[in-house]
Structures are given as C-alpha cells and as structure tokens.
Design a protein with these regions (language model features):
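Membrane-interface micro-motifs in multi-pass membrane enzymes
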Residues: 62, 70-74, 121-129
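Transmembrane alpha-helices of multi-pass inner-membrane enzymes
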Residues: 84, 104-116, 120-144
C-alpha cells in the first residue's frame, strides 16, 4: 500500500525512503568512484531534492548505510566498508571455538542486514556497540 501511496504523492515512511534512494542515486551516478566527500550528504541531498522533488521532505541521512557510503565515499568507500565485514567473516571461520565462530559470523550478518534500513554506523551508540563486540569476537586470545 505504501508504494502505491508514494506513486500518488503521499509522504509515507516508505515513500520518503524511496525518494531518498532515488535522489541519492542521481548524485551517486555523477560521482561513482570517490563520492562527494565525507559529511557532504545533507548539502548535496538538499540540492538534488530541490531539483527533483521539491514538494518532498529533505533529509540529512538516507536511512540506508550503503547509499550513504556510496554517495559520500563512492565505490572505493563501499568496498572498504565491505572489506571490514569480509575480514570479520574470515576471522570467525578460522576460530577453533564454536561460540566465537557462530557469534563472529552473526555480528556482521546482523549489521549487513540492518544497514539496509538505516545508517547504523553513523550513530555513536551503534558504532560503539559494533566496535565493542568486534574487539572481543575477533581478538585472538590464544596468542597471548
């Protein structure tokens, strides 16, 4: 229903997110490799929103971490971010302890999924939680 409402001009939650994504992709296509720069999303989004959909609400966050990273840091930034998660998967699979293997696999999966619905690594608390759990899950205690 919300997608239908969006096409009719309604300002629903999903409609706003669709609009954020459509407008963000316009900017990403112009700056695909290195993006527009860290922290420049709000200004660039305001410009593209005024151009494409001035009747719709603007935002300082596209509510999708992948879109945010692509827009600000380009493909280089997205690959760098995904490399962190790849390395976490690699470390978890190499752990001899089942609990570390399972938890070490679950943490990146959780974040990779929820980052489709919001920019969770943009907030201080969720970033701190991610780093805190990562520091314990991927530390090789046996080597000390």
């Amino acid at each position: 229903n919300e997608i239908t409402e969006y096409s009719l001009g309604s300002d629903s939650s999903i409609g706003q997110r669709i609009n954020f994504t459509i407008n963000s992709w316009q900017v990403i296509k112009k700056n695909p490799i290195i993006g527009i720069g860290t922290g420049d999303f709000p200004q660039e989004y305001l410009k593209i929103n005024q151009q494409n959909s001035p009747e719709r609400r603007t935002t300082s966050n596209p509510h999708n971490m992948y879109i945010l990273v692509l827009m600000e840091l380009g493909i280089v930034g997205l690959i760098s971010m995904l490399a962190i998660f790849y390395y976490q998967f690699k470390l978890s699979f190499n752990s001899p302890k089942k609990i570390i293997c399972d938890s070490g696999f679950t943490l990146p999966v959780l974040f990779l999924v929820v980052m489709f619905s919001d920019s969770y690594l943009l907030g201080h608390y969720t970033t701190l939680m991610f780093v805190f759990f990562s520091s314990f899950l991927y530390k090789d205690f046996e080597k000390n």
